[in-house]
Amino acid sequence: INWKGIAAMKKLL
C-alpha cells in the first residue's frame, strides 16, 4: 500500500 492509499482512507474516515 502506498501513502496515497492511506491518505485516501483517512479522508474516508
Swiss-Prot record:
<keyword id="KW-1213">G-protein coupled receptor impairing toxin</keyword>
<keyword id="KW-0295">Fungicide</keyword>
<dbReference type="GO" id="GO:0045087">
    <property type="term" value="P:innate immune response"/>
</dbReference>
<dbReference type="GO" id="GO:0042742">
    <property type="term" value="P:defense response to bacterium"/>
</dbReference>
<keyword id="KW-0044">Antibiotic</keyword>
<comment type="function">
    <text>Antimicrobial and mast cell degranulating peptide. Shows antimicrobial activity against the Gram-negative bacteria E.coli ATCC 25922 (MIC=15 ug/ml), the Gram-positive bacteria S.aureus ATCC 2592 (MIC=3.7 ug/ml) and the fungus C.albicans ATCC 2002 (MIC=7.5 ug/ml). Has little hemolytic activity. Its mast cell degranulation activity may be related to the activation of G-protein coupled receptors in mast cells as well as interaction with other proteins located in cell endosomal membranes in the mast cells.</text>
</comment>
<dbReference type="GO" id="GO:0031640">
    <property type="term" value="P:killing of cells of another organism"/>
</dbReference>
<protein>
    <recommendedName>
        <fullName>Mastoparan-like peptide 12b</fullName>
    </recommendedName>
</protein>
<feature type="modified residue" description="Leucine amide">
    <location>
        <position position="13"/>
    </location>
</feature>
<comment type="similarity">
    <text>Belongs to the MCD family. Mastoparan subfamily.</text>
</comment>
<dbReference type="GO" id="GO:0005576">
    <property type="term" value="C:extracellular region"/>
</dbReference>
<keyword id="KW-0399">Innate immunity</keyword>
<keyword id="KW-0391">Immunity</keyword>
<dbReference type="GO" id="GO:0090729">
    <property type="term" value="F:toxin activity"/>
</dbReference>
<keyword id="KW-0800">Toxin</keyword>
<dbReference type="GO" id="GO:0050832">
    <property type="term" value="P:defense response to fungus"/>
</dbReference>
<keyword id="KW-0964">Secreted</keyword>
<keyword id="KW-0027">Amidation</keyword>
<keyword id="KW-0467">Mast cell degranulation</keyword>
<keyword id="KW-0929">Antimicrobial</keyword>
